[in-house]
């Protein structure tokens, strides 16, 4: 418990493999809305639209790509 990131790989520059905590200055370690340890800006498409659905976009506050509520 208390893990902030997946510490399986010491190669991840955002995550301290010894503590499973984000490195200083890192906002995230992985996820569709995480790029180089930082949250991708709000409104960036993280999952393109399919059919009549709208694009899923990053919130700017999380590494996760939220599902569009209008699916």
UniProtKB/Swiss-Prot annotation:
Cysteine pairings via disulfide bonds: 5-20, 7-15, 14-37, 28-34, 33-58, 46-65
This protein's UniProt keywords: Cell adhesion impairing toxin, Disulfide bond, Hemostasis impairing toxin, Platelet aggregation inhibiting toxin, Secreted, Toxin
Domain Disintegrin: residue ranges: 1-71
Short sequence motif Cell attachment site: positions: 50-52
Subcellular location: Secreted
GO MF entries: toxin activity
Distribution of this protein across tissues and organs: Expressed by the venom gland.
GO cellular component, one term: plasma membrane
Primary site of residence: secreted
A GO biological process held by the record: venom-mediated suppression of platelet aggregation
Domain of life: Eukaryota
Similarity section: Belongs to the venom metalloproteinase (M12B) family. P-II subfamily. P-IIa sub-subfamily.
Biological role: Inhibits ADP- (IC(50)=56 nM) and collagen-induced (IC(50)=49 nM) aggregation of human platelets. In vitro, inhibits adhesion of endothelial cells to vitronectin, type-I collagen and, to a lower degree, fibronectin and laminin.
More about this protein: The disintegrin belongs to the medium disintegrin subfamily.
Subunit relationships: Monomer.
Database matches in PANTHER family: ADAM A DISINTEGRIN AND METALLOPROTEASE DOMAIN (PTHR11905), DISINTEGRIN AND METALLOPROTEINASE DOMAIN-CONTAINING PROTEIN 28 (PTHR11905:SF32)
Name of protein: Disintegrin simusmin
Source organism per UniProt: Crotalus simus (Central American rattlesnake)
Lineage: Eukaryota, Metazoa, Chordata, Craniata, Vertebrata
